[in-house]
């Protein structure tokens, strides 16, 4: 009998499909319709099953050894089904967001906080309400004759003018404390010390050299270099062990030889020769010292034996980045590039990212130009896709001049180093796309089969799924008004699965963790954009599904943050990992969680109270773990506290906010929301102005908190986080809690009494007061406003902050 005529097809006699939600969550599915998992977390409406693809004959595929490279390739872990109904989401419903200021012209990436607030009508109404209430409160106190602008601490002079008023935190009695006798943890309670510390950061960042000659500048670099013995015996080994696995851009065998030559030259002539890159090499050494110092500083908090880092911590590296900036951007026009110059730009980019002094800006966007310069220099130097596409033996040819610096020896050594640098720059390019929605600077990718392996660890691994990340970029940026959400979710899921099978070693594990967290944050941003769009289109069923997904992913990300700050991990790499958790907590604490709370039904008091406590726990962790060291976080502490007070004290909060804004549109529509703003309030919030007689349906809180033991446990975990921080040492609890105006001696007793009692009379039903017209616009607006504010805040909590 001809065997080909009787091919046996493999048949399955059991159900093998699982619902799409369980597949995403990698959970065991009971195959119900809906399954118990989806029912438990409240997303049963999205519990869907995909039919199996037709089975293949068993003997139609031979052994693995018989397969060609193209047959071995697995194009997708999840098959793309052309039969799905395409669904499009507009991620810029209010248009692309530009900001023009004296200091910078900026188009914000679509997943920055600014763009999320611009896109989300609920959050935009909330933040506008907050701005108006605070501004009017301060205007009210100006009328009392108190000179608020005069109240500023001497230590704040290094901060921007917009930040000066935020430095007045302490009650008057704190002036008498002997700071030298405070315990380190207790000293954090004195918020003025934090402001003073951050002012020093900014002074170092804006360092002025006086005589700006090259000679003076080079002499300062030479003076800042560490002792050769300390550098070679302590700093370089520390960097190689803990930091180089994260930033594999230097070949230290040859680099150490160049260091010895540089120090010998300095000892003879005490000068630097830019023609042979000595100034650039010296600046690379300074940045290595800076990174090691930051690493040691954050490692000490989690290490038992701090003496291991003593020699590195004793270095003063605060001005090193300022010194390097001139060499990186000022001494030589960006027309040609060398290896040292490329390495210097990459390390400067890293220092901006991990530094506590806000090198990347409030929206994590200010290094985009520097990143573009890095990518352009890579392309100019040949550090590009060609290095991984082509064979080293037959397709790549390098000539090395005898005067080249540094001289690595053979062609293969250059190619190996260039490949690592290229993969690192590629990884960074895709990471920023995932975190902020920034369009990729590297506008190309390749699906390689088999994926090339060059013995470079994680640098090789990212090549396996880069085409998927680039696909996400294209789907978002081809037309942000019309994003195929099914295809976008498919690409994200496939990327997650590819990352999930990668092997990790000890010191590169944080790179994989960072990539996975970045992808989770991208998922969060995608789902949030869906929710905002469904609210605009009135699709209630899709709203419920998106809200449940957003809620679940939010508490999962929050749990990962709790885990990170509860375990030491690799202490020497916390300086690097802190940033990704800072970005996540910033997004959750300032945008996502307030938006979730504002959308919860008023009738669900238990769920609402639980999420307000969740926000308090998250804020305590965010500002205590990160806000004490990072300027970007510290600067957001005031708005974080006001957000919490609004959500904590406001019964029927969203209803009250909309009525307040509609009232403002009727009475003060032309008044600027903030200084220099010429836009009318009704133009800023067109959806709120759509019907001034009744609340728009899209602002009606209709959602319930998803149920289930897993979600409840994750919420409780975050609620209990605040117990870690003693009441008096919880920066989030104490900030603006005990603040007092420094009242001039000429202030009358009656004025002081009125200030002291301003926040004592509170009622629970804010919606009733805000909706009443008795105090209408005929001369009684001030009394109406102040009653509303008194119900929300103790004005002293923020009068001292503006």
From Swiss-Prot:
Q: Which GO terms of the cellular component aspect does the record hold? A: mitochondrion; nucleus
Q: Which domain of life is it from?
A: Eukaryota
Instruction: Show the segment(s) annotated as Disordered.
Output: 749-779
Pfam families the record matches = Zn_clus
Is Transcription regulation a UniProt keyword of this protein? yes
What molecular function terms (GO) are annotated for this protein?
DNA-binding transcription factor activity, RNA polymerase II-specific; RNA polymerase II cis-regulatory region sequence-specific DNA binding; zinc ion binding
Give me the stretches of Polar residues compositional bias: 749-768
Family designation: Belongs to the OAF3 family.
Q: What is this protein called?
A: Oleate activated transcription factor 3
């Amino acid at each position: 009998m001809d065997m080909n005529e009787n091919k046996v097809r493999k048949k399955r006699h059991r159900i093998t499909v699982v619902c799409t939600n369980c597949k995403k969550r990698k959970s065991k599915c009971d195959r119900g319709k809906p399954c118990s998992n989806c029912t438990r977390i409240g997303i049963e409406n999205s519990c869907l099953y995909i039919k199996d693809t037709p089975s293949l004959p068993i003997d139609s595929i031979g052994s693995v050894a018989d397969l060609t490279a193209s047959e071995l390739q697995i194009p997708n872990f999840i098959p793309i089904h052309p039969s799905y109904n395409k669904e499009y989401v507009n991620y810029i419903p209010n248009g692309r967001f530009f900001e023009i200021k004296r200091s910078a012209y900026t188009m914000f990436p679509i997943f920055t906080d600014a763009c999320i607030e611009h896109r989300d009508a609920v959050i935009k109404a909330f933040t506008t309400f907050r701005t108006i209430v605070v501004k009017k409160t301060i205007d009210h106190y100006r009328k009392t004759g108190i000179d608020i602008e005069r109240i500023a601490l001497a230590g704040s002079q290094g901060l921007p003018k917009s930040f000066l008023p935020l430095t007045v935190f302490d009650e008057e009695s704190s002036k008498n404390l002997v700071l030298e006798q405070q315990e380190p943890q207790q000293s954090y309670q004195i918020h003025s010390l934090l402001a003073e510390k951050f002012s020093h950061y900014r002074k170092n960042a804006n360092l002025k050299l006086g005589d700006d000659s090259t000679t003076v500048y080079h002499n300062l670099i030479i003076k800042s270099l560490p002792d050769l013995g300390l550098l070679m015996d302590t700093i370089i080994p520390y960097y190689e062990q803990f930091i180089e696995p994260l930033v594999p851009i230097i070949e230290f065998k040859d680099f150490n030889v160049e260091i010895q030559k540089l120090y010998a030259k300095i000892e003879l002539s005490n000068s630097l020769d830019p023609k042979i890159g000595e100034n650039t090499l010296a600046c690379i050494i300074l940045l290595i010292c800076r990174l090691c110092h930051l690493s040691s500083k954050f490692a000490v908090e989690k290490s038992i034996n701090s003496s291991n880092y003593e020699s590195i911590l004793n270095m003063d590296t605060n001005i090193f980045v300022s010194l390097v900036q001139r060499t990186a951007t000022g001494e030589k026009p960006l027309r040609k590039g060398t290896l040292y110059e490329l390495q210097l730009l990459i390390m400067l980019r890293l220092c901006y990212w991990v530094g506590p002094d806000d090198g990347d800006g409030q929206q994590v966007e200010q290094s985009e130009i520097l990143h573009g310069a890095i990518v352009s220099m890579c392309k100019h130097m040949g550090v590009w896709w060609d290095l991984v596409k082509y064979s080293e033996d037959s397709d790549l040819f390098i000539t090395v001049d005898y005067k080249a610096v540094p001289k690595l020896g053979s062609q293969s050594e250059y190619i190996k180093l260039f490949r690592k640098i290229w993969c690192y720059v590629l990884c960074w390019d895709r990471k920023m796309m995932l975190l902020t929605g920034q369009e990729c600077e590297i506008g190309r990718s390749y699906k390689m089969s088999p994926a090339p392996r060059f013995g470079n660890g994680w640098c090789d691994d990212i090549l396996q799924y880069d085409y998927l990340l680039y696909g996400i970029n294209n789907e978002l940026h081809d037309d942000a008004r019309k994003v195929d959400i099914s295809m976008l979710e498919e690409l994200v899921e496939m990327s997650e699965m590819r990352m999930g099978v990668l092997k990790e070693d000890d010191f590169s594990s944080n790179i994989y963790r960072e990539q996975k967290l970045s992808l989770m944050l991208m998922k969060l941003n995608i789902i949030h954009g869906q929710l905002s769009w469904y609210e605009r289109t009135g699709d209630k069923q899709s709203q419920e599904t998106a809200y449940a997904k957003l809620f679940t992913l939010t508490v999962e990300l929050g749990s990962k943050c709790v885990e990170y700050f509860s375990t030491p991990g690799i202490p020497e790499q916390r300086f690097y990992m802190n940033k990704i958790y800072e970005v996540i907590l910033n997004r959750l604490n300032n945008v996502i969680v307030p938006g979730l709370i504002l959308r919860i039904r008023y009738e669900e008091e238990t769920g609402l109270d639980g999420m307000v406590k969740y926000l308090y726990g998250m804020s305590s962790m965010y500002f205590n773990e990160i806000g004490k060291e990072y300027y970007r976080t510290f600067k957001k502490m005031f708005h974080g506290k006001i957000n919490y007070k609004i959500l904590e004290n406001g019964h029927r909060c969203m209803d009250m906010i909309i009525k307040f804004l509609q009232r403002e549109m009727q009475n003060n529509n032309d008044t600027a929301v903030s200084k220099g703003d010429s836009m009318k309030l009704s133009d800023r919030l067109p959806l709120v102005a759509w019907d001034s007689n009744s609340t728009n349906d899209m602002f009606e809180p209709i959602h319930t908190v998803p149920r289930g033991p897993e979600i409840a446990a994750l919420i409780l975990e975050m609620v209990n986080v605040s117990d870690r921080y003693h009441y008096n040492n919880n920066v989030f609890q104490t900030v603006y809690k005990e603040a007092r105006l420094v009242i001039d001696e000429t202030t009358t007793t009656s004025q002081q009494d009125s200030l002291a009692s301003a926040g004592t009379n509170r009622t629970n039903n804010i919606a009733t007061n805000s909706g009443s017209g008795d105090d209408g616009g005929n001369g009684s607006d001030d009394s109406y406003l102040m009653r509303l504010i008194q119900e929300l805040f103790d004005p002293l909590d923020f009068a001292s902050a503006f």
